[in-house]
């Protein structure tokens, strides 16, 4: 998709605040600092549109980005960050669960994992949960520029094994915000799910 017009239209914490115009939505989930904002910036070809931070746990709301007046990217708070309170983690969990299980406009979820590491318990739980609710999933292995392309198969097989990956219901791609590797493939998946 050729992207010229993007606008962050709102930050929401409950269904009453979600957009009401019926556009399709693609949510981005993953642990804190896995690269959700960097993926968004790369997809829309803007350097600092979605705020990136070296400080984990920065995103605390569902952030809706209107892309070309055709769809929304929904940046979901990162999970697995230990320095937020248990009460705050529960609130994030409830907010995310409400959104993902009840939002009719949600067409799919891009679940980000770090290509260099085994998926965390939270990554596995999120994948299983999305799969349980029959939500189309694209697993994106970020930071792939940090590993040799000759080792992609090894890393892909390991990530899929750890997640219990179901290829009949999910897709998998490597991605790098540094080199833009995988950008077009992610867009193809998004377009197919609009």
Curated annotation (Swiss-Prot):
Residues that coordinate or bind Mg(2+): 37, 59
Family stated for the protein in its record: Belongs to the TRAFAC class TrmE-Era-EngA-EngB-Septin-like GTPase superfamily. EngB GTPase family.
Binding site for GTP: 30-37, 57-61, 75-78, 142-145, 175-177
Listed PANTHER family: ENGB-TYPE G DOMAIN-CONTAINING PROTEIN, MSS1/TRME-RELATED GTP-BINDING PROTEIN
Protein name: Probable GTP-binding protein EngB
Annotated GO CC locations: cytosol
MF annotations from Gene Ontology: GTP binding; metal ion binding
Species for this entry: Leuconostoc citreum (strain KM20)
NCBIfam families tied to this protein: GTPase_YsxC, small_GTP
EngB-type G domain location: 22-194
Domain of life: Bacteria
GO process annotations (BP): division septum assembly
UniProt KW keywords: Cell cycle, Cell division, GTP-binding, Magnesium, Metal-binding, Nucleotide-binding, Septation
Cofactor(s) needed by this chain: Mg(2+)
Function: Necessary for normal cell division and for the maintenance of normal septation.
